[in-house]
Swiss-Prot record:
EC number: 7.1.1.-
PANTHER family on file: NADH DEHYDROGENASE SUBUNIT 1, NADH-UBIQUINONE OXIDOREDUCTASE CHAIN 1
Name of the protein in its database record: NADH-quinone oxidoreductase subunit H
Keywords: Cell inner membrane, Cell membrane, Membrane, NAD, Quinone, Translocase, Transmembrane, Transmembrane helix, Ubiquinone
Amino acid sequence: MTDQLITLIWIIIKIVLILVPLLVAVAFITLAERKVIGYMQSRVGPNRVGFRGLAQPIADIFKLLLKEVIIPTASSRYLYLIAPILSLVPALAAWAVIPFAQGWVLANVNAGLLFLFAMTSLGVYGILVAGWASNSKYAFFGALRSAAQVVSYEIPMGFALVGVLLAAGTMNLQGIVLRQSGGLWHWFWLPLLPLFVTYWITAVAETNRAPFDVAEGESEIVAGFHVEYAGVTFALFFLAEYANMVLVSAIATVIFLGGWLSPFQGIPGLESLFAWVPGIVWFVLKLSLFIFTYFWMRATFPRYRYDQIMRLCWKVLIPVTLVWIIILALAIEFHWTHWL
C-alpha cells in the first residue's frame, strides 16, 4: 500500500512538473506572438505593463478572471460550461507520452503515436458542443466549419504519421527519436520531407490558426464558436488553442526533428563542443522554431476561403501523402535508401 501511495504521489508530482511550465509558457507565448507580429508589421507591440511589456500576460490573466461569466438565456447551460473543458483537457492529456529527453516522459507507452493522434482529434468535440450549446447561429456556423475542417485534415495527418511509423518501425515516441540518431541529416524531416510539410500544414489547420482560422472569421461570423463566451470560459478556449499549438509543435519535434537529439551528432569537433547541452534544451529550441512559424504564418498569409481550405486538403495533401507512403513502403521493402 505504501509503495502504491509513493508511486501515486510521484506521478502527481511529474504531472505538475509538466503542466505548470506548460501553462506558464502558453501565457508568455501570447506575449511573444504579439511582440513578433508587431516587429514584422513595424509596430512596438505591448509595452505598457512591466518592463517592455513583460508583465502583459499576467495582466491579461487577471482581466479574464475578473470578468463576469455571462451564460446566454437560451443556451444549454451545462453543455455551454463543459465545452471549454472538453477543448482543453485533450491538449493537456497528450503530454503524458511526449518525451522531453532520454527517460523524461510521464508514460512511456508503446502506442504513443496512436495516443497522440487520438488526443489531437478529440479537441473538436469541445468546439462542436460550444457551437451547439450557445444557441447562436454564428457560433453554430463556426462549429460546423471547424468540425468539417478538422475531420478532413485528420486524414492527411494520419497518413503522415503512418509514414513515420513505417520509417521508425515503432509507435513508441522514444523509439522514434532514437531511430533518428546520427545527426541532422538522419532526422526524418529529410527522407519524409513531403510528409513533414503535410503534417505541418495539417497541424496549423487542426489548431484553427491563421490562415486556416475560418471557424472564427471575424469578418464573416463575428468570432465563430466562442462568440458567446467571456471571462474564464473564454480564457479556457484561448488556453486550449495555444496549448494545442505547443502540443503539435512538440509532436513535430519528436517525430521529424529528432526530439532531444543534438543536431551536431556525428560532426567532429562540434559534437564534443556541444556535448554539455542537455537534451531538453535542444527539444525546447526545436519546439520554439515551430512556434515562431505559427507567428510568421499569421503575420504573412491572408485567411483562405473555406472552399480553398477543403480543396487543399482533398485534392493536394491527401494524394501527396498516399503517393509518398507507397514510395516509402517500396523504398523500405527493396532497400532503395540508406536513411531508413
